[in-house]
Design a protein with these regions (language model features):
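Short hydrophobic beta-strand element within catalytic cores of glycosyltransferases
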Residues: 332-335, 345
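A conserved mid-protein helix/loop that constitutes part of the nucleotide-sugar donor-binding site
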Residues: 68, 245-260, 324, 360
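Nucleotide-activated donor-binding/catalytic signature segment of Leloir-type glycosyltransferases, i.e.
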Residues: 280-297
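Conserved acidic donor-binding segment of nucleotide-sugar-dependent glycosyltransferases
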Residues: 347-348, 352-359, 368-374
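A conserved, positively charged/aromatic
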Residues: 156-183
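A short, well-ordered alpha-helix in the C-terminal region of glycosyltransferases
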Residues: 361, 368, 375-390, 396-405
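Aromatic "clamp/platform" in nucleotide-sugar-dependent glycosyltransferases that forms part
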Residues: 315
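Short His-centered aromatic/hydrophobic patch
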Residues: 136-142, 160
């Protein structure tokens, strides 16, 4: 019976520094997949609060705010689905973020792929709480979970949220996704599943997009932010992205594209860190007065309500949370045609999909929407309907439930 199933969710949250730009950009220090993994930690901690098995959630350094949205809600859904739910924590702030109806379990912080104290702790938790499934969402979690479950009947489910290259010649991958003891892999996007299908049977993979609850933007709607000096009738484009030392985020192309736009009504608001060279590029072109680089802001999402467009100009990316946040605010989206990001937007219905690494394409797409405010508004409305229909927590948790039950029944 489902009630008798115990599930352990191992999540290693990246530490979040002061002044992160938005929910999208938490945990960026880890590279390409770090944004996605930190965001996915929210999804699974929230899912744990609603699925209902014994959940061990959030092994590693967590952040109260990061744990709080997707994580707490999903945890609630797991509980409602009749799983006995446990959530692990490493800091007091994380402990406080755990819902009252879920038992917290303290675990040591770890980042290495082999950490003996952590492995011992996981084995003890498995025995004490009769865990049947471990859901590990990054490489360190997965590796330590595989070591900890040796000699047990516990099934390990992994997660992949990035298209970073996998090399069979690199033996460390056999401590993770290429290990035959991984019972199933959850993939954030269809593109990721297709990439992994070169190494893993499609039957052992499930696409489970990260959910988003529009209610998470209530505070942003209640306390919206604006940029001083931008006229009320301006066409405002927002970009939420930490780009310092990350040229693949496409900020340079976005700035170059802005300099190609002659419409004086178009203003760009960038929130997040950036390289000095990009700032200088913004100041040295014809659109300098219309490019507003606000830096790191904890209230970054508060700049979305009431704006016209949210743009993701990345050359490569995962599945940006900023696009979900924009859709929840009924803001039209422009996204480059790259794996992951393009799955969020329906071209010509909720926004525009453009070729990557092209200032000209950026300028043309912004210009098209600036000249057609009715279409821009319609895109925003359609995006809102898409987020509340296709990216629900209920669908996300149901997919987890199905996979957990599937691996247990084998």
């Amino acid at each position: 019976e489902l009630q008798a199933v115990c599930v352990a969710v191992l999540i290693d949250l990246e530490p979040v520094g002061q002044g992160q730009t938005s929910g999208t950009e938490r945990g960026i220090a880890g590279g390409d997949g770090a944004d996605d993994n930190a965001d996915h930690c929210q999804s699974n901690a929230n899912a744990a609060h609603g699925l209902g098995a014994d959940i061990i959630n959030s092994l590693g350094l967590a952040h109260g705010q990061c744990f709080g949205q997707t994580g707490v809600q999903a945890a609630g859904h797991l509980v409602q689905a009749a799983f006995n739910t446990y959530v692990t924590y490493t800091t007091e702030d994380e402990h406080k973020a755990i819902p009252k109806d879920i038992t917290g379990i303290e675990v040591p912080y770890f980042r290495k792929k082999f950490n003996w104290p952590t492995i011992q702790c996981i084995r003890k938790i498995i025995k004490t709480h009769q865990i049947h499934v471990i859901y590990a969402i990054n490489s360190s979690d997965l590796s330590n979970a595989l070591f900890a479950t040796l000699g047990t009947q516990v099934k390990v489910v992994g997660y992949r949220g990035t298209q970073a290259k996998i090399r069979r010649s690199d033996l460390t991958y056999y401590l993770g996704p290429l290990n035959p003891r991984v019972a199933h892999m959850m993939c954030a996007t269809q593109d990721i599943k297709e990439q992994l299908s070169k190494f893993i049977s499609p039957a052992k993979m499930t696409v489970n997009p990260k959910p988003y609850d529009v209610n998470w933007m209530k505070d942003a709607f209640t306390h919206p932010q604006s940029v001083e000096g931008i006229p009320d009738d301006a066409f405002q484009v927002v970009c939420l992205a930490n780009t310092k030392h990350r040229p693949f985020k496409g900020l340079r192309q976005l700035i170059a594209g802005m300099h190609l736009i002659q419409d004086p009504r178009v203003h760009l608001i960038h929130l997040g860190d950036y390289d000095e060279a990009d700032y200088q590029l913004a100041q040295q072109g014809p659109a300098a007065a219309r490019i507003h680089m606000l830096g790191l802001r904890k209230d970054a999402v508060h700049f979305l309500p009431g704006k016209d467009v949210c743009i993701c100009p990345s050359i490569r990316d995962a599945s940006p949370r900023s696009l979900r946040e924009a859709m929840a605010c009924k803001v039209a989206c422009i996204v480059t045609d790259i794996p992951g990001a393009r799955e969020l937007v329906v071209d010509g219905q909720t926004g525009m999909i453009i070729r990557p690494d092209s200032p000209e394409a950026i300028a043309a797409s912004i210009g098209t929407l600036a000249r057609d405010p009715e279409k821009t508004k319609a895109f925003g409305e359609a995006g809102y309907q898409r987020i509340i229909t296709h990216y629900t927590m209920e669908k996300y948790v149901q997919n987890l439930t199905n996979v957990f039950q599937q691996v247990i029944d084998k």
